[in-house]
Regions:
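Short, flexible turn/loop "capping" segments at secondary-structure junctions
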Residues: 38-40, 109-111, 172
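ATP-dependent carboxylate activation and anion-phosphoryl transfer catalytic cores
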Residues: 8, 123-199, 207
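Short small-residue beta-strand/loop micro-motif enriched in glycine and branched aliphatics
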Residues: 44, 114-117, 171-176
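Phosphate-binding site of ATP-dependent enzymes
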Residues: 51-132, 158-160
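Active-site nucleotide/adenylate-binding loops and adjacent lid/helix of ATP-dependent enzymes
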Residues: 1-79
Length: 207
């Protein structure tokens, strides 16, 4: 795994399920609760938190409607953050707060209770450490240009990398523009133009 090879913190407590026979082994290795998600889906589609073998088998069946490969990870207790990366620079982190069991599809697109905190409420040392980790993780898997890195902070205070989002939303209410605005770039100045094989920033003159 590129993250492990690059000596960045990585959640080792992860397995890939390809058949119901894998569920028992994964549950024995990782324990409950678990989070189940299709390997190649976005927007938390097909994701579920499970607390028993019966729920795990049902979640696998549901997730396989979206992808033949399904990831199962040990549940991490703690706050979730996301860090936008733009042109080799980590932007201010955003803390994601939801009353739901996790930051699921409903929390992202339908709920009025989800909170996005930017600044995220971290002290300066933790904020800089999180940004550095996110940028390192982004580059370790060969990403360039722009994206987002999702991270959780576990009950011991350690950062746990979740994933890189290589196609984050770019609407006026999406998280990358939110972080850019906190960093001093308004929505009219954050314009991405494709060139030289990657996404790069281009300035815009407001008229």
């Amino acid at each position: 795994q590129p993250w492990s090879a690059d000596a960045a913190p990585r959640r080792a407590d992860l397995a890939v399920l390809t058949s119901p026979a894998d569920c028992e082994a994964a549950a024995a290795e990782l324990g409950f609760p678990l989070i189940v998600k299709p390997a190649h889906e976005g927007s938390s589609i097909g994701m579920a938190k499970v607390d028993s073998a019966a729920e795990l088998n049902k979640a696998l069946e549901d997730a396989r409607a979206y992808d033949s490969d399904v990831l199962v990870e040990a549940w991490v207790r703690g706050p979730e953050y996301t860090v936008a990366i733009v042109d080799g620079r980590a932007l201010p982190s955003i803390r994601l707060k939801t009353p739901n069991a996790f930051y699921d599809f409903e929390a992202k697109y339908q709920s009025n209770s989800t909170e996005y905190l930017c600044p995220a409420g971290l002290d300066d040392a933790d904020e800089q450490a999180l940004r550095a980790l996110a940028l390192k993780a982004f580059e370790a898997v060969g990403c360039q240009g722009w994206g987002r890195v999702d991270v959780m902070r576990d009950e011991h205070g350690d950062w746990q990398l979740l994933e890189v989002n290589t196609v984050p939303g770019m609407t006026d209410h999406s998280l990358v523009p939110m972080a850019a605005k906190a960093d001093g770039d308004g929505p009219r100045t954050l314009v991405l133009a494709h060139g030289f094989g990657c996404w790069v920033l281009r300035p815009v003159i407001d008229k």
